[in-house]
Amino acid sequence: MSEAAQTLDGWYCLHDFRTIDWSAWKMLPNEERQAAIDEFLALVDKWETTESEQQGSHAIYTIVGQKADILFMILRPTLDELHEIETALNKTKLAEYLLPAYSYVSVVELSNYLASGNEDPYQIPEVRRRLYPILPKTNYICFYPMDKRRQGDDNWYMLSMEQRRELMRAHGMTGRKYAGKVTQIITGSVGLDDFEWGVTLFSDDALQFKKLVYEMRFDEVSARFGEFGSFFVGNRLAAENVPTFFHI
């Protein structure tokens, strides 16, 4: 039997995609719309306080295309806290006009494929920064879920640890070409959601998403073993721009 990779696990992650019922939103009187926006911004202010205390992080992006209109990406130490945040959002007036489109539950993950040394990894500052990240405030985001293939000779889980480590090392070399251009956060979701991993990319240049994903398709680990779900791409929505976005 092949050896399972050990993982380092950090904050839990929720990608909460919603569509907006603009027709119903437009029917609200101006003062009710403004009250709903103010209530929502008060909730976001609580998220920002949590982030400033480094007890979690969040990002809000408007989604391009018809799959969704807005994304709330939330990181917290526990699954319970994610549920509390989701529930608090759903209780707001604004949520009456935010219809569920897609969601993804996972946990920030680092594998031992690239591990070395005997030091406790949870005590290494760089590892902690990656397990408990403050999300980048870049202009653009790209999210997609993925699996490793399990078909015939292309069964990832039948490869030896050494084979998997070498394939992932080569894959990582491709990713490092985009250092400074793209920030990547990998979240594990085996047993938590429908795919095995979620990949979230951040950049100030959306074209880099296309370049990175395309180049990685030629890595053997992706060409032979990668299976992908839907891709979501969006633009950052800063708190100060929320009133403008929801203005009618």
UniProtKB/Swiss-Prot annotation:
GO molecular function terms listed in the Swiss-Prot or TrEMBL record: heme binding; metal ion binding; oxidoreductase activity, acting on the CH-CH group of donors, oxygen as acceptor; peroxidase activity
The entry's keywords: Heme, Heme biosynthesis, Iron, Metal-binding, Oxidoreductase
UniProt-annotated binding residues for Fe-coproporphyrin III: R130, Y144, P145, M146, D147, K148, H171, Q184, S222
InterPro entries to which the protein is assigned, alphabetical: CHDC (IPR031332), ChdC/CLD (IPR010644), Dimeric_a/b-barrel (IPR011008)
Positions annotated as active site in the UniProt record: Y144
A Gene Ontology biological process term: heme B biosynthetic process
Names of required cofactors: Fe-coproporphyrin III
Top EC group: oxidoreductase
Catalytic activity: Fe-coproporphyrin III + 2 H2O2 + 2 H(+) = heme b + 2 CO2 + 4 H2O; Fe-coproporphyrin III + H2O2 + H(+) = harderoheme III + CO2 + 2 H2O; harderoheme III + H2O2 + H(+) = heme b + CO2 + 2 H2O
EC number, as in UniProt: 1.3.98.5
Metabolic or biological pathway, per its Swiss-Prot or TrEMBL entry: Porphyrin-containing compound metabolism; protoheme biosynthesis
Cofactor, free-text remark: Fe-coproporphyrin III acts both as a substrate and a redox cofactor.
Family indicated by similarity: Belongs to the ChdC family. Type 1 subfamily.
The protein's role, per its UniProt record: Involved in coproporphyrin-dependent heme b biosynthesis. Catalyzes the decarboxylation of Fe-coproporphyrin III (coproheme) to heme b (protoheme IX), the last step of the pathway. The reaction occurs in a stepwise manner with a three-propionate intermediate.
NCBIfam families recorded: PRK12276.1 (NF008913)
Name of the protein in question: Coproheme decarboxylase
Recorded name of the encoding gene: chdC
